[in-house]
Amino acid sequence: MVARAGGREAVTRFVRIAAWASAGDRVALLHVQPVTGRTHQIRVHLAYAHFPIVGDPVYGRRGDTSGLARQFLHAWRLTVRLPHAGERTFTAPLAADLVAYLETLGTPAARSPLLAEVM
């Protein structure tokens, strides 16, 4: 995907983990995998696809009312290749402020089995 003329190609894969619909607003928790590593790649691609990141002051919605003090971005699982240790995978549960935000949305209207892993 190239989001603007003259931009370099960047590839991002994303899958919906859960979705909420509250007060006319739609929110989705996504599993995102950047294939290329461009600056702001995830933020730009999700905004371009009409899924702006909650709390993003640049590419997000104006007048964000989430109450988050930061962007809803979380590195849940990272896999790296280390020269002497081979491939290693690290995971981290969703941060407490992000879990609290999701709880304010109520029960998801749709969810995948991956939701239990992420939370």
PLM regions: where:
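RNA pseudouridine synthases
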Residues: 1-119
